[in-house]
């Protein structure tokens, strides 16, 4: 029996390998409550590395992508934006300049050519990239960089015609550039879009229009909000409340939104009970299951004590129908210039924490992978 089981596993692995090779050029997609990558419908693990987009040393990019792929991680979320209001003098990477009432996309060596290199490298290694196209926050320019050039305020960003025209022009420049790349997992409308105190219709209408626009440019790839998952019924407390202008279920129902996204930062949100995060994951999964679309648990982390709490959240996500993948915040690396930015959430490759947050989790994902029915997001016996 032992030898038979070994033979079955070997043949199964060979079949999966052959299937993956045959489907390696296919585009990631959603199938029911599952994601499909390289022809395989399964649960996937990954991370975030915002800093990758701004590296200028190709060897550093290669090192990071190699370590990521070798670790068994599959989905990597990187920034697809870097908005400035004055052209940098130090060859700093930026993607768009907003100045004097106009916007210019930087397609040069310190612009979108940096994304070109990353995406090419991801293609070679079978890594799939989630790319948000603007930041709500001021880091790397954000929405306020548009406002500096065109006027207005944050709540008005979503409805300002001049701002939206510039944003759409940038979206078109980026999305059209990579329409045929199998490395793109999904385009995201923004990183953590909010509209504090606004009616939820503002973000919903903006997301409906923008997701349709992206699909018209690129029908090959998935589109998602990139939001934190705020706005759920049954609890009036933050972040379940609708204060930030988001309605998770309403936005998930948009036809051109392919999956739901959620983030989890108990400390930042003023939640003292970290086990609260398990319910946050389960409640979103229930909405995704009802909508028939998968959930991507795309950002989560703790400032220190990563193994204790993040492991619990990972186990909950892995065990909950409706959750299809998770990406911890964030992947850290030792580059030629030193360590990448340590925001206290960072888990560095090769560290002791890497084993529990990454290696052990990847192994658990592999166990589930062979028990997961296609399209159902359910468990085997």
From Swiss-Prot:
GO biological process, one term: mannan catabolic process
Enzyme class: hydrolase
Lineage: superkingdom: Eukaryota
Cross-referenced Pfam families: Cellulase (PF00150)
Residues binding substrate, per UniProt: 79, 191, 265, 329
Catalysed reactions, as listed in the record: Random hydrolysis of (1->4)-beta-D-mannosidic linkages in mannans, galactomannans and glucomannans
E.C. number(s) listed in UniProt: 3.2.1.78
Record's keyword terms, sorted: Carbohydrate metabolism, Glycoprotein, Glycosidase, Hydrolase, Secreted, Signal
Positions annotated as active site in the UniProt record: 192 (proton donor), 299 (nucleophile)
Glycosylation sites recorded in the entry for this protein: 100, 273, 334
Cleavable signal peptide: 1-22
Compartments in which it is found: Secreted
GO molecular function: mannan endo-1,4-beta-mannosidase activity
Major localization listed first in the record, in broad terms: secreted
GO cellular component: extracellular region
Protein task: Endo-1,4-mannanase, a crucial enzyme for depolymerization of seed galactomannans and wood galactoglucomannans.
The family this protein is said to belong to: Belongs to the glycosyl hydrolase 5 (cellulase A) family.
Name of this protein: Mannan endo-1,4-beta-mannosidase D
